[in-house]
Structures are given as C-alpha cells and as structure tokens.
A protein has these predicted regions:
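Catalytic glycan-binding domains that act on GlcNAc-containing polysaccharides
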Residues: 2-198
C-alpha cells in the first residue's frame, strides 16, 4: 500500500536533531539579534528564520556548503546578487540576503489568500530549498492529479517525493520541527532580550 509506505517514511523523517542543546543555545544567542532584525523587516517570526538557519548550518556562520552556499543561511552568491546583497561571508549580509529571498519567494509565489500561514511557510521553505519555479510546477502537477495545490502536507509533498525524492520533504519537516522546539521555549529564548531592555 503506497499510503502505508508513505506514512512509514514520513514518520522516520520526523527524527531530527534537538536544536536547543547547550551548543545550540549558545550559537542561537550569538546570532539572535541579527535574525530578529531581518525577520522583523520582512514580517516573519524570527523563530522561523532561526529554525531555517539551524537546518542550513546548525547556526554556524562560518559554514560552507555545496555549490558555493555560504554562512549561517547557506546563501549562494547568485541568490545574494539577485537580492542586491554582497559579501555574504559577513553574518549580517548573509541573513539579509536570505531574508530578502524569503520575502521575494513569499511575495512573488505564495501570496495567495487561499494559503493558510502554516502551508504558506511550508511552500516557502520548499522553494528556498528547491527553487520557487520547481515548487510551482509541483503545485500544477498536484492540481492535474486532483490533489490540493494549496496544501503542502500530504498533497504537494507527495508530488515532491515522487519527482525529486524525500530530500525536500525531510527539509520542510525538519525546519518545522526546529521551529516547534524553538516556539515551545520562546519565553526563555526572548527573556534575555527583555531583561536587557529594562
């Protein structure tokens, strides 16, 4: 049964690293002001940006990835240039380029009022990972197959799994898990900032 196989793989993919161990908390505290500043500029919960950064680099601003992906947000030089940002080896510029790209994806591809915020964020994450045009193609294929093109979970993600494999499905799921872990401890993560402001 294809649905049962999908469920087994889906459950296995939910096993992710805990982002709030001692090292994770220390790294988050160092980059938090930058994440908060740029998340606020694009009207995004900073914990979404933090969860994405944890997935991309385990909050390591010096990370280097495939295809020239660089820094905390694993931004490529081409993406940064397209967003009008240079020197992505610098933390501030890296996060700025990523935030601008996320805002661009949201505005140009996933602004429809038909999308609820949870689904919108899932599509934005998938597009950050694969590119927005590929995700839009998957939505069109979902529509052709009678699936809901405005729902990532259990709908468009099925098309993604068939066409590009489990990588993007695992990616979106992991970022969501990290976000939930951060969200659960939001009060503690933001307490230092509130204390410092007083």
């Amino acid at each position: 049964n294809q649905d049962a196989a999908f469920e087994r793989v889906y459950r296995r993919l939910y096993k992710v690293q805990y982002p709030l161990d001692r090292v994770g908390r220390q790294r988050l505290e160092k980059v938090r002001p930058t994440l908060q500043r740029y998340a606020e500029q694009i009207e995004l919960d900073w914990l979404n940006l933090a969860a994405l950064a944890f997935k991309e680099s385990t909050l390591n601003p010096a990370a280097r990835g495939a295809g020239g992906a660089t820094g905390l947000m694993q931004v490529t030089p081409a993406t940064a240039r397209a967003m009008g940002v240079s020197n992505i080896h610098q933390l501030d510029n890296n996060v700025q380029a990523s935030a601008k790209y996320l805002a661009n994806i949201r505005r140009n591809f996933f602004a429809s009022p038909r999308l609820n915020e949870r689904e919108r964020m899932a599509f934005i994450l998938a597009a950050y990972n694969l590119g927005p045009q590929r995700v839009q193609s998957m939505r069109a294929e979902a529509r052709r197959r009678g699936l809901n093109p405005d729902q990532w979970f259990f709908q468009v993600e099925r098309i993604a799994m068939e066409t590009v494999g489990m990588g993007v499905v695992a990616y979106v799921n992991s970022v969501n898990k990290y976000y939930l872990a951060y969200q659960r401890e939001r009060y503690l993560l933001e307490a230092d900032r509130k204390t410092a402001a007083n």
